[in-house]
């Protein structure tokens, strides 16, 4: 039977680093360094880590206090999950050991190979030629490359496979809209090295593009078209009951014809089948609707709020939102009614849309269908 909380021989110092910022009741069990054969139960509580020796008795049973005795560690953990019984807190959430993580990821890897092959997006490594690096990220680097003569972006993972990234690839494989960056294929083989191929976006991300040009090089009509491209991509997501959850200019890329496309679907999910939040999921406060930050529930209406922030970014030429407000104070300001002023020289028609997207009542915000119509109307009537 698997014991995901059993971490083997790790030091007290390493344990305290692992548990340092975890919630009360988070725990793991490690082999005792001072008493061979014994274990140590390590438990997070009020910002500290408590260490309890688990004694191995002569009858091969285990105990923390010589009163409650258990035939194995599994029953010991089950007992202290029901009742703290002398501990500082009952056991709540285990920290999964690296061995279990690796086992799960290897199983996931093999399953994904079968899944991607059936979907027709599994790519042979010999058909991919990798060129110069064009971007660096926390989880990997991005290279320019070619797949069967087609120019592509090749994402290479730094630390082997990650289930999060394979999940993102699966999500992207279901998308089909001109304003969403397209998945070309996934390279997975016996080497356990993973590459994800997407369409090549020659003009990079929208933040860098806007900052390098500025208001004197870009006409307002071009800015509005960027916004309409994004709204159209999100109209497709909305129609398919999908939410992006990380909509921001940094995740908007421009192709060779300066068409804006939404990228980075690492946090995206179905409204009907929401995923549980993993520890790697940190939502960007300045772009996320307050009700989503409070409840953890995301809808198309929360994406609409984020789209309003994108409008502000576009017409401020990629300034950081909520300037001069500390990030820890942003939510409080919004809940008290504060909204950003429109950027300098922003058309009234655009600032009116921003105001609608930031309505405190999600039901009063426009849909992406309505936003597309508004932007198309602004372009047609030259309301800029």
Task: Name what the model sees in each region.
Residues 1-138:
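Domain-scale recognition of modular recruitment/scaffold domains used in eukaryotic signaling
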Residues 141-159:
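Glycine-rich ATP phosphate-binding loop
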Residues 238-255:
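Catalytic-loop of the protein kinase fold
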Residues 165-170:
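Regulatory alphaC helix of protein kinase catalytic domains
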Residues 190-199, 203, 207-208:
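A conserved loop-to-beta-strand element in the N-lobe of protein kinase catalytic cores
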């Amino acid at each position: 039977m698997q014991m995901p909380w059993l971490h083997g021989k790790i030091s007290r110092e390493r344990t305290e680093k692992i548990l340092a910022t975890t919630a009360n009741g988070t725990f793991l069990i490690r082999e005792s360094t001072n008493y061979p054969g014994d274990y140590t139960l390590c438990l997070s509580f009020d910002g500290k880590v408590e260490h309890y020796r688990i004694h191995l008795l002569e009858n091969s049973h285990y105990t923390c206090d010589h009163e409650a005795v258990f035939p194995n560690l599994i029953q010991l953990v089950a007992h202290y999950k029901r009742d703290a019984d002398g501990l500082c807190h009952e056991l709540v959430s285990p920290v999964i050991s690296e061995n279990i993580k690796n086992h799960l990821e290897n199983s996931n890897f093999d399953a994904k190979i079968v899944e991607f092959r059936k979907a027709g997006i599994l790519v042979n490594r010999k058909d991919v030629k990798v060129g110069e690096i064009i971007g660096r990220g926390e989880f990997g680097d991005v290279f320019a490359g070619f797949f069967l003569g087609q120019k592509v972006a090749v994402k290479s993972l730094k630390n082997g496979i990650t289930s999060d990234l394979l999940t993102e690839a699966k999500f992207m494989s279901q998308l089909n809209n001109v304003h969403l960056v397209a998945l070309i294929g996934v390279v997975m083989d016996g080497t356990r090295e993973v590459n994800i191929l997407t369409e090549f976006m020659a003009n990079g991300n929208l933040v860098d593009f806007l900052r390098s040009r500025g208001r004197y090089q870009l006409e307002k009509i071009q800015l509005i078209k960027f916004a309409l491209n994004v709204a159209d991509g999100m109209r497709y997501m909305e129609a398919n009951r999908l939410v992006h959850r990380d909509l921001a200019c940094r995740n908007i890329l421009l192709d060779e014809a300066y068409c804006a496309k939404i990228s980075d679907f690492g946090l995206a999910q179905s409204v009907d089948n929401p995923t549980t939040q993993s520890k790697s999921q940190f939502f960007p406060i300045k772009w996320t609707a307050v009700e989503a930050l409070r409840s953890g529930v995301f809808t198309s209406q929360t994406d609409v709020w984020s789209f309003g922030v994108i409008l502000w970014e576009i017409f401020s030429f990629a300034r950081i939102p909520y300037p001069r407000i500390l990030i820890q104070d942003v939510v409080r300001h919004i809940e008290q009614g504060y909204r950003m002023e429109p950027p300098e020289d922003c058309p009234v028609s655009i600032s009116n849309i921003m105001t609608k997207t930031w309505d405190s009542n999600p039901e009063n915000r426009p849909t992406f269908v309505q936003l597309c119509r508004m932007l198309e109307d602004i372009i047609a009537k030259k309301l800029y």
